[in-house]
Swiss-Prot record:
Gene Ontology CC: peroxisome
Organism domain of life: Eukaryota
Residue sites binding substrate per the record: 154
Catalyzed reaction equations: a (3R)-3-hydroxyacyl-CoA + NAD(+) = a 3-oxoacyl-CoA + NADH + H(+); a (3R)-3-hydroxyacyl-CoA = a (2E)-enoyl-CoA + H2O
A biological-process GO annotation: fatty acid beta-oxidation using acyl-CoA oxidase
Subcellular location: Peroxisome
GO molecular function annotation: (3R)-hydroxyacyl-CoA dehydrogenase (NAD+) activity; 17-beta-hydroxysteroid dehydrogenase (NAD+) activity; 3-hydroxyacyl-CoA dehydratase activity; 3-hydroxyacyl-CoA dehydrogenase activity; enoyl-CoA hydratase activity; estradiol 17-beta-dehydrogenase [NAD(P)+] activity; protein homodimerization activity
Span list, region (3R)-hydroxyacyl-CoA dehydrogenase: 1-309
SMART domains: PKS_KR
Protein name: Peroxisomal multifunctional enzyme type 2
PROSITE patterns cross-referenced by the UniProt entry: ADH_SHORT
Spans annotated as Enoyl-CoA hydratase 2: 310-598
Amino acid sequence: MSSSDGKLRYDGRVAVVTGAGAGLGREYALLFAERGAKVVVNDLGGTHSGDGASQRAADIVVDEIRKAGGEAVADYNSVIDGAKVIETAIKAFGRVDILVNNAGILRDRSLVKTSEQDWNLVNDVHLKGSFKCTQAAFPYMKKQNYGRIIMTSSNSGIYGNFGQVNYTAAKMGLIGLANTVAIEGARNNVLCNVIVPTAASRMTEGILPDILFNELKPKLIAPVVAYLCHESCEDNGSYIESAAGWATKLHMVRGKGAVLRPSLDDPVTIEYVKDVWSNVTDMSKAKHLGAIAEASGTLLEVLEKLKEGGGDAIEDAFEFNSKELITYALGIGASVKNAKDMRFLYENDADFAAIPTFFVLPGLLLQMSTDKLLSKALPNSQVDFSNILHGEQYLEIVDDLPTSGTLLTNGKVFDVMDKGSGAVVVTNSESFDESGRLLVRNQSTTFIVGAGKFGGKKDPIAGVVPLQPAPNRQPDATVQYTTSEDQAALYRLSGDKNPLHIDPQMALLAGFKTPILHGLCTLGFSVRAVLAQFADNNPALFKAVKVRFSGPVIPGQTLRVDLWKQGTRINFRTVVVETGKEVISGAYVDLKSSQAKL
């Protein structure tokens, strides 16, 4: 209710405040009474360590309230006898509407020095006392279909504090208690919230620095607690931190997590946990869960994916900005000599954008950085840079592409084939922006030399994106590019640091006389040709590309890209001019629309 002057009132309400003889509790009691509530001032009157008892502290506050024209009674019971505390309210005023569990003591000791008594006394007052008072008040509140309950936690409980094992355990326990009370009371308009105050009091005197102690006035927190207890406040299960005239809401969050096995039939190993630990502890995609059902629902989703034999078994974060986009564009031959390439090379260009094939990198780097997508597919085979060849690549752009940000990429093994001389592993990945929007899909086909003859199937399953042979006619257009002798050295700066492309010894081990150009670099050149010829260099028109890497390119060789237009599908092949050999075959780009230059 509110008065004519707009002030929130508590007329007709009965408020029980424990530990109200001083500090925060006193301020709560005075403010409730000032605004019309009838107040039970509970205080045992002991020291801050819980020793002794006295009626004086509660009596002084009751006198203050009465002298100001308010109504109040004192209660001297220990909060452990919560039923007696609430009985005082019922006998004096016939109801209880508000309960502020504020009473507390300190018995600070280090972990090793904390005695059984130190532990029990602190937990009895803070946690058990709050439970007993709440348990006694709850039936009255449910019957009258109204109640407001406050639990008092602490930053020490949330973050920990040296020498307070008993106190911090109790204060964190109060958050759990409040969560359940909030759930049980909701249907009867009995709401429960947590206050996390930092204020000067008998308990903190001598602990906090003087300058901080003097500014942490309990009076500045009282209005926050009072509002949480007003009938107009509908918060339930909230944790509110307040100090020095400031307040904020706290809540717990949970990261996206990581799946620790490929399927329900696979074990969880210590080594696998170690390998994905950075994903387990990654909080970049953390979110708040409002109920235990949400947490259980997420686990059910994970189990369903495991039941299907997959899921987001591997995850990786991919960060990029204009620098990475420009480095990539230079790596696939974009040049300032071509005015239309400036949109890919200058971050202040009005049309600055990413070349779409840049977004093969999140899936590729996920595969390279973890090495688990391939090795778990062939657990009995050696998989390393010396025996893997990139066979095919599919890239699909699902939504508008940003020019900077962080992408979370989920990858899994999709198919494994036995080709005799080696194995073919198909991996799928999806990349999401920070809001959870799906931007990119990648499908990569890798040939592992010498890993075949394991008795597997030879043909792909449905869902492996097929190639499409070029039409049997003359190309509609041809574009030619000359690569630099440093092309591979430049392209590898975008993240594909397979030594095969720069180290002569590694190239020899893989069966090449000299380091070869990355297949994905050749792909980038080829897609640039498609965009230039059929999309007016507009990357927004690009939808998807599929290619097979059918031969090596030596840096410095010339690439000829032959193009066939069939509606919005552009078939192409890429040939090394010096040798006449195809290096990309069965390839096509799908455009959203075409702006042909034939």
